[in-house]
Design a protein with these regions (language model features):
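Catalytic cores of nucleic-acid ligases and guanylyltransferases
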Residues: 1-260
Length: 260
């Protein structure tokens, strides 16, 4: 599908939830600053849309980009419906497995997605697509993120990924130092375009900077945070569980001054 750079070029949006597919970024050659973009870390995990159904609050579907339901493979996310403060919702994020430094473990994630035993999986949520039966795909990104922070209660396996406005180069430098795979840059006023690979979202790869083990060893979720973020639904004040504690600890080492 061709790029969609404005609402006027936006295709007719599918009815939720059956035919919804993730919006995809285009690559960017280098890090950049922009007052029009929100920047957030990306671990390069498995993109998954989570559907919390209105008819049965205990029912959860986790659909990958091919429409395959992964919910039975990830039982640690069974409590996600209880963490959504709404009758129903659809959220977008990535499934990841990380090591004790917070770096992605693609082999561990692959094992879990094949139904094999393996380390715990975390769901890193960064967008809200529908709330209480109402699609909000046309709402600007910053508004969807505001609603996400009010709606999602983080847990042992769920984190709401923070973003920073404007300072993409600084975040990219920090992400490289911490061994995270990429930075996702999204136009803060952008709608959500299901199934579209759009320049409204750009992915900047971040080849890790090799550092001594001491730079990453001993990262603990209970450590001192430099973020200055309120406990507003991002989960950054929480200690997390086995799947999310290393992620939270690593996020605390990134240059987030406020929630965008």
């Amino acid at each position: 599908m061709t790029d969609q750079l404005s609402l006027r070029l936006e295709p007719e949006l599918p009815r939720l939830p059956g035919d919804l597919r993730p919006m995809l970024p285009r690559s960017a050659p280098a890090a950049f600053d922009s007052a029009e973009h929100l920047f957030e870390p990306s671990w390069g995990g498995e993109r998954v849309l989570a559907f919390i159904e209105p008819a049965d609050r205990a029912h959860l579907r986790l659909l990958d980009g091919h429409g395959r339901d992964l919910a039975d493979l990830i039982p640690e996310l069974a409590d996600l419906p209880a963490r959504i403060l709404a009758r129903s919702a659809v959220v977008d994020g990535e499934l990841v497995v990380v090591d004790q430094t917070g770096r992605a473990d693609p082999e561990g994630l692959g094992a879990r997605l094949r139904g094999e035993a393996g380390p715990p999986v975390a769901y890193l949520v960064f967008d809200l697509l529908a709330l209480d039966g109402r699609p909000i795909l046309r709402e600007p990104l910053f508004r969807r993120r505001q609603l996400l922070r009010r709606t999602l209660t983080p847990g042992e396996s769920v984190v709401a990924v923070p973003a920073i406005l404007g300072e993409g180069i600084a975040l990219h430098t920090a992400v490289r130092a911490q061994g995270i795979g990429a930075v996702l840059a999204r136009v803060r006023a952008s709608p959500y375009l299901p199934g579209v690979r759009s320049r409204l979202w750009r992915l900047v790869e971040a080849a890790p900077i090799e550092t001594s083990g001491a730079d990453h060893a001993g990262v603990a979720a209970g450590g001192q945070s430099s973020l200055g973020l309120a406990a507003d639904g991002t989960g950054l004040r929480a200690e997390g569980g086995p799947a999310t504690a290393p992620v939270l600890a690593l996020i605390r080492r990134l240059p987030f001054d406020e929630e965008a």
